[in-house]
């Protein structure tokens, strides 16, 4: 198995799938790369998932978003939609690399500022509390992301740990778990994407832009909405540099 994985890591990267929770977060990159919405997606007809695709340099780029909830019409954020689209995308597209990109809250106590863009080193859940031996470890689900030392050095990107939960706010229980996870940023999808990708052994990178300061003095939702447009633009710049760096390289070069 190690020999097969070694061969894969030395083969040029060809197909990338971006998993992005909200189309608003993905739109600047969609526009920049001139990606086209796929009308006949490889997904079940019942789902609201949206797929954009196109060629950029030598890369087959696919951006998949969970789309809007069919009942309420709001963006389908959170771990469940993220897990589903990741699973379906791996089966249908068979990517060489998954990039989960999006916005996140940051912690000023860990040095995070609005518009900072982080490459995630380790990801875990903070709201799956199972106080039973071994199941407690399973609940946290801590995983390392695919190592990208050359990319981080070349692009001078910040690195931090990510904690994932299904709430935008932070309860005292969540805060305790996030502290235990030593997280610099928190989101609502990353650990779920990493969990599914790990099952299929698909290398995964998580890149997050900070829209709000969780341990600041302003309401998270207010700060998120205020900074969303500016931070997605900054995220787009970073993602474009990441794609340019990946182009023509193998996984082992990252």
Curated annotation (Swiss-Prot):
Disulfide bond positions: none
Record-listed N-acetylmethionine modification sites: 1
GO BP annotations, alphabetical order: L-methionine salvage from methylthioadenosine; nucleoside metabolic process; phloem or xylem histogenesis
Observed effect of gene inactivation: No visible phenotype.
Ligand binding (adenine): 186, 212
InterPro entries: MTAN (IPR044580), Nucleoside_phosphorylase_d (IPR000845), Nucleoside_phosphorylase_sf (IPR035994)
Reactions catalysed: S-methyl-5'-thioadenosine + H2O = 5-(methylsulfanyl)-D-ribose + adenine; S-adenosyl-L-homocysteine + H2O = S-(5-deoxy-D-ribos-5-yl)-L-homocysteine + adenine; 5'-deoxyadenosine + H2O = 5-deoxy-D-ribose + adenine
Catalytic center residues: 25 (proton acceptor), 212 (proton donor)
Gene Ontology terms for molecular function: adenosylhomocysteine nucleosidase activity; methylthioadenosine nucleosidase activity
Binding site for S-methyl-5'-thioadenosine: 103, 186-189
Pfam families in the cross-refs: PNP_UDP_1 (PF01048)
The protein's enzyme class: hydrolase
Quaternary assembly: Homodimer.
Function: Enzyme of the methionine cycle that catalyzes the irreversible cleavage of the glycosidic bond in 5'-methylthioadenosine (MTA) and S-adenosylhomocysteine (SAH/AdoHcy) to a lesser extent, to adenine and the corresponding thioribose, 5'-methylthioribose and S-ribosylhomocysteine, respectively. Contributes to the maintenance of AdoMet homeostasis and is required to sustain high rates of ethylene synthesis.
Family under the similarity heading: Belongs to the PNP/UDP phosphorylase family. MtnN subfamily.
Name recorded for this polypeptide: 5'-methylthioadenosine/S-adenosylhomocysteine nucleosidase
Originating organism: Arabidopsis thaliana (Mouse-ear cress)
Record lineage: Eukaryota, Viridiplantae, Streptophyta, Embryophyta, Tracheophyta
């Amino acid at each position: 198995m190690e020999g097969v994985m070694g061969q894969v890591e030395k083969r040029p990267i060809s197909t990338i799938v971006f998993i992005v929770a909200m189309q608003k977060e993905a739109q600047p990159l969609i526009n920049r790369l001139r990606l086209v919405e796929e009308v006949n997606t490889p997904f079940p007809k019942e789902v609201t998932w949206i797929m954009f695709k196109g060629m950029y340099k030598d890369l087959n780029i696919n951006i998949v978003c969970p789309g809007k909830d069919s009942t309420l019409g709001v963006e389908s954020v959170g771990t469940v939609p993220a897990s589903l689209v990741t699973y379906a995308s791996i089966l249908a597209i068979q990517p060489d690399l998954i990039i989960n990109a999006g916005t996140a809250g940051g912690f000023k106590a860990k040095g995070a500022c609005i518009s900072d863009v982080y490459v995630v080193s380790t990801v875990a859940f903070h709201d799956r509390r199972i106080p039973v031996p071994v199941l407690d470890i399973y609940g946290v689900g801590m995983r390392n992301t695919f190592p990208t030392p050359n990319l981080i050095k070349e692009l001078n990107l910040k690195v931090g740990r990510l904690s994932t939960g299904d709430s935008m706010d932070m309860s005292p229980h969540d805060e305790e778990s996030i502290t235990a996870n030593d997280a610099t940023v928190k989101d609502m999808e990353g650990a779920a994407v990493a969990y599914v990708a790990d099952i299929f052994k698909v290398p995964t990178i998580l890149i997050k832009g900070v829209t709000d300061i969780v341990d600041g003095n302003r309401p998270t939702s207010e700060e998120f909405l205020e900074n969303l447009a500016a931070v997605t633009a900054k995220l787009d710049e970073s993602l474009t540099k990441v794609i340019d760096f990946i182009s023509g390289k193998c996984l082992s070069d990252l």
